[in-house]
Amino acid sequence: MARRCEICGKGPLVGNTVSHANNKNKTRSLPNLRSVRANLAGEIRHIRVCTRCLKAGKVVKAGRGRPTASAQA
């Protein structure tokens, strides 16, 4: 499973940690991904979305189960 947002395509970043002795070690910064049940074109799927896309409202979350009587009124 790829560590990539399915909406914006954000993925891991690669950089260096540099010690005081100027030694360089590779490090990866992973995106903050969440698994979400989303409604995509009328189809409910599990997708991996970054929290930035969730906050921006780019994803319509799918509800769980049938609506209750109070929600229909």
From Swiss-Prot:
Molecular-function GO term, any one: structural constituent of ribosome
Pfam families: Ribosomal_L28
GO biological process, one term: translation
Domain of life: Bacteria
Protein name (Swiss-Prot/TrEMBL): Large ribosomal subunit protein bL28
GO CC terms of this entry: ribonucleoprotein complex; ribosome
Alphabetized InterPro entries for the sequence: Bacterial_rp_bL28 (IPR050096), Ribosomal_bL28 (IPR026569), Ribosomal_bL28/bL31-like_sf (IPR034704), Ribosomal_bL28_bact-type (IPR001383), Ribosomal_bL28_sf (IPR037147)
Keyword field: Ribonucleoprotein, Ribosomal protein
Family of the protein in this entry: Belongs to the bacterial ribosomal protein bL28 family.
Native source species: Anaeromyxobacter sp. (strain K)
